[in-house]
Amino acid sequence: MGKIIGIDLGTTNSCVAVMQGTQPTVIENSEGNRTTPSMVAFTKSGDRLVGQAAKRQAITNPKNTIYSIKRFVGRKFDEVPNEKKLAPYDIVNEGGEARVKINDKAYSPQEISAMILQKMKQTAEDFLGEKVSEAVITVPAYFNDAQRQATKDAGRIAGLDVKRIINEPTAAALAYGLDKKQSSEKVAVFDLGGGTFDISILELGDGVFEVKSTDGDTHLGGDDFDQKIINFLADEFKKQEGIDLRNDAIALQRLKEAAEKAKVELSSRTDTEINLPFITATQEGPKHLVINLTRAKFEAMCSDLFDKILEPCHRAVKNSSVEIKDIDEVVLVGGSTRIPKVQALVKEFFGREPNKSVNPDEVVAVGAAIQGGVLKGDVTDVLLLDVSPLSLGIETLGGVMTRLIEANTTIPTRKQEVFSTAGDNQTSVEVHVLQGERPMASDNKTLGRFHLGDIPPAPRGLPQIEVTFDIDSNGILSVSAKDKATGKEQSIKIEASGKLSDAEIEKMKRDAKEHAAEDMKKKEEIDSKNAADGLIFSTEKQLAELGDKIPSDKRPALEGALEKLKDATKNGTTESIKNAMDELSKVWNDVSSNLYQAPGAETNASEPTQNTDGSGHTKKSGNDGEVENAEFEVIDGNGK
C-alpha cells in the first residue's frame, strides 16, 4: 500500500505533506512553493488552471476565477448571502444549493474543491514517484456535519479515499507535540486562517492528544480583513473621483490583490502606500489610485473583527474546565496570526507570549500527515481524542431541541435516548435531526429528517421509541430510531445540506479523470513541441556549420526531413511530431556515417540533439551548467 498524504485544504492556500520515515515532510509544488493558492480558473480557450497559474491571471479574468470556495462548501444558497455579494464570480441557486456558474455550467463547491485536491494529489505523486490514493484532509474544528460530508465528497471526486477528516487545530497540535510525547502540558491552539477561526484547548501527555474543548467562527478570517481594506480603498476613491470601483470586476480584483499585499506589509511596517495606476478611466482620461494606509487606521477599521476573535476564546476556555493560568502554551496557526494586533490580543487574553515555533502556513498539513502515519502504523504511541464541536439532537414537542450529544463530547461516541409519541394512536414519528446550541429547533441547523412508521396504535406517551446518535472518528453523524415494542428500526447516515448523491459523485469523478487525462495530453504536446524545437535549432546550427561537408545527394533528404518536422510542430499531433523527429534523426544518422567515412573527415559532426528536458528548459552538464561540443585529439603513448 502507498502513503497516506496529509492535505490542508485552506480557504486561501492549500498545503500537502507526507511522512518520510518518522518525520513529516512538506511537499513543494511544481512551481517550487510549499503552499498552493486555493484558486481555480477557466480560460476563454477552455483550459482549466489551478493554483498559482489561476492566481496570476485573476485580474484579467475575475468572473471565471474562483477563490475562497471553502466558504461555500456544504452550505445552502440562502446561508451565504454575504459571501455571494463579495464574490466576483456568479453564485446561483440550484435546488437550494449554492453553485458556481461558469459559462453554461454550474459547478458544486465540492467539484471546485476537488480540482484543488487533485493539484495537491499530483504534487504528492510527483514527489513520491508513485500513485497516491489515500489522504487525511483537515477542516475547521467548527465545521458542521454538512461541511464535513461535503469535504469528504470533494476528496472522492478527486480520486482520494479520505481515511480521516481531522480538525485543523488538532492537526496543528499533533505537529507541535510530536516530539514532546513524554512531556505533559495544556495547550491552546489559536487558528486564524483565510476564511475561518478556531480555538481549541488540548491536554498533551504520554503521546495522548486530548481535545478538551473547541470553538470558533466559520465566517471570520483573512478574507474579512482584506474586505475591510477593499471597502476603505473604494470609499476613498469614490470620495476623490466619484467612481465606485466595486462596480468594475477587474478593478475590484486589483483592489483585492492590493488589499492582501497591504495587509501583509502592515505586519512588518507601520504604514504602506497603495498605488494602483490606471485603475479606471473617464472621458477626462485615466485615473490612478494612490492612498496611504497606516497600521493604526487598519486596526481601527477592523476593530469589530478583533472583538469577534475574543468571544470564541472565552467560550472555549470556559467549556474546557481549564483555567487560563494553567495553559502552558498558546500555539499560533494560520497566516492571519501574523497580524500584530492579533498577536497582541492573544498575549493579553492568555497572559503570555504566544508560541511561534511552528510554521503557521504548513503546520496543519504536517499534522494531517502525522495522522496519516498513525493510521498506516508508521507513527506509534500517539492517540488522538477529538471532540464534536456542536451539540446534536432532535426536535421534540413544542419545537424544542432536545440534545443527545453535547458540544465538546469526545468522539467517536454513541448516545441513546427513549422518546414517545405526542398524540393518541400515533402510528408514525418524524425524526428531525438538528445541530447547534440554541434551545429552539427552528434556530438550529437541520441535518436531516426521516420517518419511523408502523407503530402500533396506543395512548400518547406509551410507545417507546429509542433514538441512537452515532458519531464516527471523522465527526460524521448517523442516526437511527427503533420501536422497542415491534423491533422495527429506521436509520440514516445524515445526507445533509450540499451532500451529493453517489451517482453525482461518480459522474464528477469521471469528469475529473477526463480533465486529468486532458492535462496529461496537453503536457505531452508541449513536451514534444519543446523537444522538436530543440532538434530543429540544433539541426539548423549543424547545417550551417558543416556547409559543403554534407554530401550534395544527402542534403535534400536532410532538409526535407527538417521541413517536415517544422510543419508537424506547427500543425501536427504529438504522434506526428514524434514520427517526424524519428525520421530526421534517422536521416542524420545516415549523413553522420557518411561524414565519418569520408577521407580526412573531422569527427565533430554528430546527430543534433534537442538538449531539453521536455519542458523547454536546457539540460545542464559540466561544472558551469553549459552544454559544449567537445573536440578530442588522438595522442600516442609518448604524448604526441
Swiss-Prot record:
Record-level Gene Ontology MF annotations: ATP binding; ATP-dependent protein folding chaperone; unfolded protein binding
Entry-linked PANTHER family:
HEAT SHOCK PROTEIN 70KDA
Sorted alphabetically, the keyword list is:
ATP-binding, Chaperone, Nucleotide-binding, Phosphoprotein, Stress response
Q: Which cysteines are joined by disulfide bonds?
A: none
Note the CDD domains from the entry: ASKHA_NBD_HSP70_DnaK-like (cd10234)
Q: What is this protein called?
A: Chaperone protein DnaK
Location of the region described as Disordered in the Swiss-Prot/TrEMBL record: 547-575, 595-640
**Gene3D superfamilies named among the record's database cross-references:** 1.20.1270.10, 3.30.420.40, Actin, Chain A, domain 4, Substrate Binding Domain Of DNAk, Chain A, domain 1
Q: What induces it?
A: By stress conditions e.g. heat shock.
- The protein's organism comes out as Chlorobium phaeobacteroides (strain DSM 266 / SMG 266 / 2430)
The answer on whether this UniProt entry bears the keyword Cell inner membrane reads no
Residue ranges with Polar residues bias:
603-615
Record field: compositional bias (Acidic residues)? 625-634
Sum up the protein's function in the record's words: Acts as a chaperone.
Q: Where is the composition biased (Basic and acidic residues)?
A: 547-569
Q: Which family does it belong to?
A: Belongs to the heat shock protein 70 family.
Question: One Pfam family name from the record?
Answer: HSP70
Domain of life assignment: Bacteria
Give the matching InterPro entries: ATPase_NBD, Chaperone_DnaK, Heat_shock_70_CS, HSP70_C_sf, HSP70_peptide-bd_sf, Hsp_70_fam
Please list the residues that carry the modification Phosphothreonine: T196
